[in-house]
Amino acid sequence: RLKKGPEILIGTPGRIFELIKLKKIKMMTVDTIILDEFDQLLSDSQYHFVDKIIHYVPREHQLIYMSATAKFKQDKIVENTIQIKTENQQLDNIRHFYMQVKQRDKVECLRKLAQVSKFRALVFFNALSDLGSAEEKLQYRHIQAVSLASDVNIKFRKIFLEQFKNDELTLLLATDLVARGIDIDSLECVINYDLPRDLEIYTHRAGRTGRMGKEGYVITFITHPEELKTLKKYAHVQEIILKDRELYVK
């Protein structure tokens, strides 16, 4: 398909740059580059690949940045900004909980939740480096969990998603950036292994559950009093009823 010259090419900046270097694709006819979730690309240190890609396209081109969670300070890299506003609302069928837990007990809490609640959950991490360790510890404790790290190739990612949809996996571990392309209509639960860095990210994560009129759950792990204050601020702004959920961990 690449040899035929596709009209639209979709991929991560790193992968596209790799194909350019391998001379698998030619960029001389490209007139538009779209960066979806560009704020996440910036925070994930992938933007240097974008700079490299731009050197291979014609000087006359259009660069479009798209994001649902970008901060205004990032507008300085964009000439023209268009904001599309939507109603700020939370579905009534999503229930929000928090659990106060020590950092070292987070994995054990995941294990207990998976065993007691019998649900499938998408677990969000702030740091990509934490995925592998959590996956290894959960699997050692006989929990069907896999991580969607950035180094997992597309073939295995599709396999993991199908297994998750078919109830063959219990926990799917991911960062916000890696989870962008995941679409699961019947997801029962979202777990914030780490407190989201801002309200927009919390809302985006919560929106993964409670779809198609089904009841959904959002559980956030809290390790410090300041985190609880921040979470309660999120709840106040979004008019969320936030409840404490206790779980005994040996």
Language model features: what each stretch is:
Residues 1-250:
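Conserved helicase RecA-like core
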